[in-house]
């Protein structure tokens, strides 16, 4: 049930952001930087809710040897959520914390699947095929769709 609530929360946020921006953003996680500074807390609440709703199931379903990857993936997502609220003297540093958290989250979640449910990595096939058709370099929303594959594969893993 917690996973379904997390999916709904993230889905609603994604739909709202697409409506606000008028198109699919280059990255869901970077869309927070298009939100007015005084409202970025919404992003933090959403991602923390997703983290806290997913963590029990995610860690419980994962083999003991790879539970640290689930923890790192959730921690990375929490960093992505918290980065907009951290006051740095330099906006670039804030974005760097955001990017590192996103990379840790994505990498750990997918490495976890390699060891626990490798068939879910097949979800990357349509992404890769479309990328070659569309040309990865010219594909403005490549990160967005990569994030969607990571979230989808992780949510499906938690649901099965």
Question: Which residues fall in each region the model found?
Answer:
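Hydrophobic alpha-helical segments of membrane proteins, primarily the transmembrane helices
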Residues: 4, 64-74, 148
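Membrane-proximal helix-loop-helix units in multi-pass membrane proteins
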Residues: 67-124
